[in-house]
């Protein structure tokens, strides 16, 4: 269970980074 939570956390971090990149580069 904890491993899954860690995975979700890293995935969320990755998505957030991608979103920020898109936001900064898109505008």
Swiss-Prot record:
Tissue: Expressed by the venom gland.
Main location: secreted
Single GO MF annotation: toxin activity
Record's keyword annotation contains NADP: no
Subcellular location: Secreted
Top-level taxon of origin: Eukaryota
Keywords: Antibiotic, Antimicrobial, Cytolysis, Hemolysis, Neurotoxin, Secreted, Toxin
GO cellular component terms listed in the entry, alphabetical order: extracellular region
A biological-process GO annotation: killing of cells of another organism
Protein family according to the UniProt entry: Belongs to the cationic peptide 04 (cupiennin) family. 05 subfamily.
Its biological purpose: Forms pore that permeabilize the cell membrane. Promotes efflux of calcium from synaptosomes, causes hemolysis, and dissipates voltage gradients across muscle membrane. Potently inhibits the growth of bacteria, yeast and Leishmania. May function both in the prey capture strategy as well as protection from infectious organisms arising from prey ingestion.
Name of this protein: M-lycotoxin-Hc2a
Lineage: Eukaryota, Metazoa, Ecdysozoa, Arthropoda, Chelicerata
């Amino acid at each position: 269970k904890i491993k899954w939570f860690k995975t979700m956390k890293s995935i969320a971090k990755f998505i957030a980074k991608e979103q920020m990149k898109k936001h900064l580069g898109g505008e």
